[in-house]
Amino acid sequence: MQKTTRTMPAHKHVALVAHDNCKPELLRWVKENKEKLQSHFLYATGTTGHMLSKETGLAIKSMISGPMGGDQQLGALISEGNIDVLVFFWDPLNAVPHDPDVKALLRIASVWNIPVATNRATAKFLFNSPLIDQEVDIEVPDYDAYLAERT
């Protein structure tokens, strides 16, 4: 597949997602990183977003709940170039009914080459990188070229 370049803005669009067992851990991480997160645009699946906003006072655009389609809403935003970073604390030890949606969200994040943090350690590395507050060029699929090849 051909690639093109997309420039991520200095103020990133960050999606925050957590499975039920991981919500307390994500909340703790968000509280610890609240000052840094305030300079970015925050999105979340419904239950996670409402909980984080209530507990931290951060402005978060909440989708609907993940099992009801919120994971897919975030995936659509990623594919449109409207999410720059995904922080997804998922529970690898417990299956969830919407597991296909979870896999699709992680797949779409990989397809569109956005950074993904799946636990506290990767989130710490990601948000302590100087790139988190800078414009960054990334390679993404050239959808126009892809479409031209297929039609």
Swiss-Prot record:
Residues annotated for substrate binding in this entry: 19, 23, 45-48, 65-66, 98
Enzymatic class: lyase
SMART domains named in the record: MGS (SM00851)
Recorded catalytic activity of this chain's protein: dihydroxyacetone phosphate = methylglyoxal + phosphate
Gene Ontology cellular component annotations, sorted alphabetically: cytosol
Chain ranges of the MGS-like domain: 6-151
PROSITE patterns linked to this entry: METHYLGLYOXAL_SYNTH, MGS
Catalytic residues as annotated in Swiss-Prot or TrEMBL: 71 (proton donor/acceptor)
GO biological process: methylglyoxal biosynthetic process
Residues in the signal sequence: none
Job of this protein: Catalyzes the formation of methylglyoxal from dihydroxyacetone phosphate.
Similarity comment: Belongs to the methylglyoxal synthase family.
Protein name: Methylglyoxal synthase
Organism: Vibrio campbellii (strain ATCC BAA-1116)
Recorded name of the encoding gene: mgsA
